[in-house]
């Protein structure tokens, strides 16, 4: 479902914070800025339903009509992001409880237990009232369910959750004996005889059973997803043709977004990279991940900031031009919408110093609003991009349940974190402008030539066979250290590490050697010496050949990186955390073998992506440098700059510092 036929542009709008005369001023400013969509009513439950069962829509009717009269459509919030004070007073047991028994209070946001029965009842009534009220309004283009689910309270440990957890476990395991087997409860005498003996993994004297913890991640994810589906069912019934979504948060650990994405009509997400970090590589990685959740379907960036946030220790603004630059970088990786939090900067409340499209003081020379207007007017020229896709020959495996499991306590290296390992491999693709998708281990891999599996600690039943077939059919599988270790219940695969991946990789890992943070070792390969940190595997070859060996410590000379021929393909194992230079060279060698090339050869810190329709190819080029760069385009092509409309023959192209180009590619005859 496309929300609009053009690039969506706008932001969260909270008119309940402002007097009515400001609403008219806002609508005019939106029109001038090129805004065509706003998210409305997200935190308005207490305004829409000021007391139990009493609804007031008059103010919202007026706001929607004003916006529609000025050409602005609505992504209408279901207002369930924060329960009202009257609800909390009436149902104090709806407040969430942490693992130590501390009850969270009203006065912030997201202060509810997802398994409270009255919460669900009241949500159903509210959502149906909103849907019935606005189902026929021509301004309604999309539903915004709740807001940033689990952002502040991702787990509740109350009695409602305990009861629901036991029910969830019964449905999953059927018998208490099966649960005991899966959880390994004979260890430390944790065996259960009855379901009602099981509680959430609350604060305990020492390590919680990791299998129980892992299942509680799954349970809370499912509980919160059930809340979303409760709202979606009502909205789909009342407005079957209006897209339904909720805003994700990129690499947000508590929620399995691959699972969630199957239930939204379009992926939307919120992104707040820190300007102090320079090149926004993790922002790019998350854009690729969000695009991949629904197999390449374009997504909407639902929130970003024009300038600065308010919740870091030091909240620096984006320098001039960077907001525009990063917006185009998001479009380059598959976005069909660029939205902000929020439209008008709040006067009061916890986010009053969070940047906005309209700052506290606005005049015609204000940099923020000027950049907002420039971007909005430019995006009107890019309707041609809506619905276009990105084609990738490389995939990185990203698995939320694996993430949960690998970061549970009592591991060989308890400071090891999943995202930095994934990002280490992604960074080398980003620097080389190689398009990449993210996939699950069970996904169809036939379209890819190379699949990278960073720290695939958990391998579930059937996933190894999927990877085995990929390699046997000619693919290259690159697997990092600490992979193939456990099953879906965090039970070790017996028979030697890396468990079910041993035959693909042709190795046996005898021991782990986790490194202190300050330790640096070296690895040798046929093209030089490289640093390695964090981890070393003691590897015995079972058919594989060494590509690099360790230089130091008692395992000097043993393999660090290996390659194994399997079927028509190969399995490469990286048994340490090598530096960027080595990873880059390794990947370049693999890509050369598969004839995978950069989209364009460009200078450092120049980002290039290609979006395609059945008819056209579009190059989006982002110069993150603060100086001009020159790049070469194929001379047998003709290009049209979609921002200024000019056509030119390929050859030398200059792009100013902190600037972009969006080019449509033609051949000599003017066609693709």
UniProtKB/Swiss-Prot annotation:
Molecular function via GO: beta-galactosidase activity; metal ion binding
Keywords assigned: Glycosidase, Hydrolase, Metal-binding, Zinc
Active-site feature positions: 148 (proton donor), 303 (nucleophile)
Gene Ontology biological process terms in this record: galactose metabolic process
E.C. designation(s): 3.2.1.23
Residues the record lists as binding substrate: 109, 147, 311, 351-354
TM annotation in the entry: none
Gene3D superfamilies noted in UniProt: 3.40.50.880, Glycosidases, Golgi alpha-mannosidase II
The UniProt record lists the keyword Hydrolase: yes
Gene Ontology CC terms, in alphabetical order: beta-galactosidase complex
Recorded superkingdom: Bacteria
InterPro entries: Beta_galactosidase_C, Beta_galactosidase_Trimer, Class_I_gatase-like, Glyco_hydro_42, Glyco_hydro_42_N, Glyco_hydro_b, Glycoside_hydrolase_SF
Family note: Belongs to the glycosyl hydrolase 42 family.
PANTHER family tied to this protein: BETA-GALACTOSIDASE GANA
Protein's name in the database: Beta-galactosidase BgaB
UniProt organism field: Geobacillus sp. (strain Y412MC61)
């Amino acid at each position: 479902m496309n929300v609009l036929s053009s690039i969506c542009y706008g932001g969260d709008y909270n008119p309940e914070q402002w007097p009515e005369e400001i609403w008219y001023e806002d609508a005019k400013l939106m029109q001038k800025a090129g805004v065509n969509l706003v998210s409305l009513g997200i935190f308005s439950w207490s305004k829409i339903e000021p007391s139990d069962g009493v609804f007031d829509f008059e103010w919202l009717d007026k706001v929607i009509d004003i916006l529609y009269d000025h050409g602005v459509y609505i992504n209408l919030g279901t207002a369930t992001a924060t329960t009202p004070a009257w609800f909390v007073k009436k149902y104090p047991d709806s407040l969430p409880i942490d693992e130590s028994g501390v009850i969270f209070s009203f006065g912030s946001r997201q202060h509810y237990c997802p398994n409270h029965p009255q919460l669900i009842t009241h949500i159903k009534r509210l959502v149906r009232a909103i849907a019935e009220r606005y189902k026929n309004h021509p301004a309604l283009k999309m539903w915004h369910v709740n807001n940033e689910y689990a952002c502040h309270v991702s787990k509740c440990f109350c009695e409602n959750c305990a009861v629901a957890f036991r029910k969830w476990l019964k449905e999953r395991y059927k018998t208490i004996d099966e649960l005991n087997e899966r959880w390994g409860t004979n260890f430390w005498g944790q065996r259960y005889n009855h379901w009602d003996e099981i509680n959430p993994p609350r604060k305990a004297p020492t390590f919680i059973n990791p299998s129980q913890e892992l299942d509680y991640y799954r349970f809370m994810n499912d509980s919160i997803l059930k809340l979303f589906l409760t709202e979606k069912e009502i909205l789909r019934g009342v407005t079957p043709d209006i897209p339904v979504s909720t805003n994700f948060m990129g690499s947000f650990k508590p929620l399995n977004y691959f699972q969630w994405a199957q239930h939204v009509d379009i992926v939307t997400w919120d992104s707040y990279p820190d300007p102090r970090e320079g090149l926004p590589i993790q922002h790019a990685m998350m854009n690729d991940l969000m695009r991949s959740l629904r197999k390449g379907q374009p997504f909407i960036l639902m929130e970003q900031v024009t300038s600065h946030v308010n919740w870091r220790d030091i909240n620096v603004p984006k320098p001039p031009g960077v907001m525009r630059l990063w917006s185009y970088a998001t479009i380059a990786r598959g976005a069909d919408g660029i939205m902000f939090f929020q439209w008008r900067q709040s006067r009061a409340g916890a986010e009053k110093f969070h940047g906005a499209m309209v700052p506290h003081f606005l005049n015609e020379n204000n940099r923020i609003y000027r950049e907002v207007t420039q971007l909005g007017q430019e995006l009107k020229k890019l309707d041609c991009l809506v619905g276009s896709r990105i084609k990738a020959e490389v995939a990185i495996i990203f698995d939320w349940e694996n993430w949960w499991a690998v970061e549970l306590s009592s591991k060989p290296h308890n400071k090891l974190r999943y995202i930095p390992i994934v990002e280490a491999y992604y960074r080398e693709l980003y620097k080389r402008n190689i398009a990449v998708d993210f996939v699950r281990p069970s996904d169809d891999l036939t379209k890819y030539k190379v699949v990278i599996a960073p720290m695939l600690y958990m391998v579930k039943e059937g996933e190894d066979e999927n990877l085995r077939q990929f390699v046997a059919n000619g693919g290259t599988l690159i697997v990092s250290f600490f992979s193939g270790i456990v099953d879906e219940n965090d039970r070790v695969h017996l028979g030697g590490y890396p468990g079910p991946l041993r035959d693909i990789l042709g190795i046996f890992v005898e021991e782990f050697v986790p490194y202190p943070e300050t330790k640096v070792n070296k690895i040798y390969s046929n093209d030089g010496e490289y640093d390695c940190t964090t981890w070393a595997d003691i590897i015995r070859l079972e058919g594989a050949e060494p590509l690099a060996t360790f230089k130091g410590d008692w395992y000097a000379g043993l393999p660090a990186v290996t390659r194994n021929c399997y079927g028509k393909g190969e399995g490469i194992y990286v048994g340490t955390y090598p530096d960027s230079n080595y990873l880059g060279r390794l990947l370049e060698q693999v890509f050369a073998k598969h004839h995978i090339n950069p989209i364009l050869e460009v200078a450092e810190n120049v980002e290039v992506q290609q979006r395609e329709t059945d008819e056209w190819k579009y190059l989006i080029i982002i110069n993150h440098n603060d100086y001009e760069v020159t790049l070469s385009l194929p001379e047998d092509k003709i290009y049209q700059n979609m921002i200024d409309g000019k056509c030119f023959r390929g050859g030398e192209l200059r792009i100013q510092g902190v600037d972009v180009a969006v080019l449509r590619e033609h051949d000599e005859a003017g066609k693709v």
